[in-house]
Structure formats: structure tokens, C-alpha cells
């Protein structure tokens, strides 16, 4: 019994590379992956197509098309299907595909947990079938979760190098806890390396604990893994974050996100007709060439609205200075570190995945999925270019 690689697949890859060069890499890789999955199915079944043998477990049942996004482009995959497996035999899904798509594996486990625990809906069932291509059992879910968790925990506990700048953010997801559905905080930290200016995802944490305790423990875990050399921390004014920074990173300057300050200011504008002028006034503050000019513009802003919008003037005088810390950095560095907008794409990718699951069965399931997503994003960042030129002034 032999299950060798089809020579036609190799010839196809060669032809694609000859005709298209590097631009054909995604097609060439898809051909190889499809061949690997076909070969894996034959080994799983114990027989190749049309092969008669007593060792055969079941039969091939065609292929299911799937488009997979990767760092080299979209891959048109053909996922092998099986049928007529003996009772008690686990279903087939190519390991070669799963190993390359951590976030998809995590999402399948999250949805499968809901299905197994009896909290699924008709919609979740359909998603499970669509993503997994087979029914799931509790043993399959446990095995998949254990393998994935070991890999993700290793990533979360890896050593951290010196980071010049750190950005912190928080988001909330729905999790089942104690018979009810509650908001669970997801804390994220990214950094800019002091040596090469590249961005990296430092860590992620999921917890139902009180905000200040969660932030303090999260920051402590980053320091334990080697975080040092931080010149500036940028974040929004999240509950408990400032207290956590004071406890764990005293003396490190804090920059409050200018974008969120702009948005928060609108809550204190008494008339719709004033909103555009208020926004422009704050832009004049934030876009000043140096700190002294920013403070002068802030003084003019407060004076301008002291009578016609006193609540806005008082709020601005107390809060806007927290968004001016970034003026201690070189001009080019300021544009990157004055807001948390650099985390926007990361949060979008997380949201795109978590909204499919809707409500997570537990904290571990949420942590698994979020970690898997940020690991993939981090790999893309590491393979990409410089985020901040540390030699620029």
C-alpha cells in the first residue's frame, strides 16, 4: 500500500512558477497544500482512491472548496471529505491545514464547546458544520483544545525584549459565568522595539476580575517576561489602568489617546453647531509644533469656551494636558504614539472572529481565540517593515 505524491502536482507547481514567477507563489503553494491534504486523507483511510484493501476505514467523498487568506495571498483550497467511517472513528480534517491557521482552529474549538455543552443555537450549528466540515464530539473538542492551548500558552509566556514604546488597550466580550452572561475584559499590549523600531504584540489577558487588579497583574506579567526600557505608554483612560501603571510602572510617562480625547470632548459641547469648531480647536492644540505652542492653544481654547460652554472649558483644562505628554518625543515618533490607532486593525481582526461566536462558554475559550488571532497578526508585523525609525529625530 503506497500513498505517494502525485507527480502531476509537482509538474503543475513547476509550470506555474515558470509562467508566473514569484507572483504565482500563492497558486503554487495552494497546489502543494491540496496535494498534502489529498495524501493525508489516503493515509487516514488506509487506502488510495479505488484501492481495494482490508485496511480501508472508509471512502473519499469529494472535496469542499475553501478560500484561505495567507501572507502570500488568497489560497484556493480543496478540502478532502470522507464518508462511511466505522462507528467510533473520529472524523477527518487535514492537520496540514489546521497547523497553519491557529485562529481558525481556536474559533472551531470555541464554537464546538458551545455545541457540546448544549448552549448552541441553530445558527451556531450551521457555523460549526461550515467551518469544521463534520460533527464534533466532546473528546474531539478536548483534544483540539489541549493541543492548541499548549502552543498558545508558550507564545504568551515567551521572553520580551527592550521596548521603547508600549500601547495598551481593552475591549469587552460576552462570556457565560455562573449561569449568566457577563462582560469579560480583554487586555492587549503592543510595543515598539528599541533596537529596530518594529512593532510586536507583547501580550493578551482575559479576566472577569476587578479592572485595577486585572491591569496590575497584566503589567506585572509583562515585566516578569522581561519588559523594560519603556519611554512612553499610550492608552485611553481605561478604568483601573492609571492605578495599575502607578503601581507597576511608576515614573514611565503616560500619553492619553488624542483621538479618544477628541471624541470625549463632544459630550461636553452644548450645541450641534459648535461641534466642528470645537474639533478644529483641539486639532490646533494637538498639531502644534511643540509643547509650548500646544499649551498656548489650549489656553486660547479654554478662554474661548469659558462662558458659552463652561463644562467643556473645565473638562478640557483638566483632561487635555494628559494628551500632550507625547511632545517629549521626536516629531516623527509623535505621529505614531499620540493615539492608540495603531491597534485599530488588531482590534478589527479580533472583532471579526469573536462576533461569530457571539457568546463564549468560558474565559479560557475567549483567551484561546484572541491569542490565536494576535499570534497571526504578530507574525505579519515581524515579517513586515519598520514601524518607527528609531534613528529619526
Model region roles, listed by residue range:
Residues 106-118:
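Short, amphipathic alpha-helical "recognition" segments used to contact nucleic acids or chromatin
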Residues 122-133:
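DNA-recognition alpha helix
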Residues 43-58, 150-161, 173-178, 380-383:
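Active-site phosphate-binding and catalytic loops of NTP-dependent enzymes
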Amino acid at each position: 500500500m503506497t500513498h505517494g505524491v502525485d507527480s502531476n502536482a509537482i509538474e503543475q507547481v513547476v509550470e506555474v512558477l515558470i509562467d508566473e514567477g514569484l507572483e504565482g507563489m500563492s497558486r503554487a503553494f495552494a497546489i502543494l497544500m491540496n496535494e498534502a491534504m489529498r495524501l493525508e486523507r489516503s493515509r487516514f483511510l488506509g487506502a488510495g482512491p479505488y484501492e481495494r484493501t482490508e485496511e480501508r476505514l472508509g471512502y473519499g467523498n469529494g472535496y469542499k472548496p475553501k478560500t484561505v487568506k495567507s501572507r502570500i495571498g488568497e489560497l484556493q483550497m480543496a478540502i478532502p471529505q470522507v464518508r462511511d467511517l466505522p462507528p467510533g472513528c473520529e472524523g477527518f480534517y487535514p492537520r496540514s491545514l489546521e497547523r497553519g491557521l491557529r485562529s481558525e482552529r481556536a474559533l472551531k474549538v470555541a464554537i464546538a464547546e458551545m455545541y457540546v455543552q448544549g448552549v448552541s443555537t441553530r445558527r451556531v450549528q450551521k457555523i460549526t458544520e461550515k467551518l469544521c466540515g463534520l460533527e464534533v464530539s466532546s473528546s474531539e473538542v478536548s483534544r483540539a483544545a489541549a493541543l492548541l492551548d499548549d502552543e498558545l500558552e508558550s507564545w504568551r509566556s515567551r521572553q520580551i525584549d527592550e521596548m521603547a514604546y508600549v500601547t495598551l488597550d481593552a475591549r469587552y466580550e460576552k462570556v457565560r459565568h455562573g449561569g449568566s452572561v457577563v462582560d469579560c475584559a480583554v487586555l492587549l499590549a503592543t510595543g515598539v522595539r528599541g533596537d529596530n523600531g518594529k512593532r510586536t504584540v507583547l501580550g493578551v489577558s482575559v479576566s472577569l476580575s476587578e479592572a485595577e487588579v486585572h491591569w496590575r497583574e497584566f503589567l506585572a506579567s509583562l515585566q516578569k517576561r522581561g519588559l523594560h526600557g519603556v519611554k512612553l505608554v499610550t492608552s485611553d483612560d481605561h478604568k483601573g489602568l492609571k492605578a495599575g501603571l502607578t503601581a507597576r510602572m511608576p515614573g514611565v510617562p503616560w500619553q492619553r489617546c488624542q483621538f479618544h480625547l477628541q471624541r470625549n470632548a463632544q459630550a461636553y459641547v452644548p450645541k450641534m453647531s459648535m461641534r466642528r469648531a470645537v474639533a478644529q480647536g483641539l486639532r490646533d492644540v494637538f498639531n502644534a509644533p511643540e509643547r509650548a505652542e500646544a499649551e498656548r492653544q489650549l489656553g486660547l481654547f479654554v478662554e474661548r469656551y469659558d462662558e458659552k460652554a463652561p463644562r467643556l472649558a473645565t473638562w478640557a483644562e483638566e483632561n487635555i494636558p494628559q494628551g500632550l505628554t507625547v511632545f517629549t518625543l521626536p516629531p516623527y515618533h509623535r505621529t505614531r504614539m499620540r493615539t492608540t490607532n495603531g491597534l485599530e486593525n488588531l482590534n478589527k481582526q479580533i472583532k471579526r472572529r469573536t462576533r461569530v461566536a457571539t457568546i463564549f462558554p468560558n474565559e479560557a475559550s475567549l483567551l484561546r481565540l484572541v491569542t490565536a488571532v494576535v499570534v497571526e497578526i504578530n507574525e505579519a508585523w515581524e515579517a513586515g517593515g519598520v514601524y518607527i525609525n528609531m534613528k529619526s529625530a
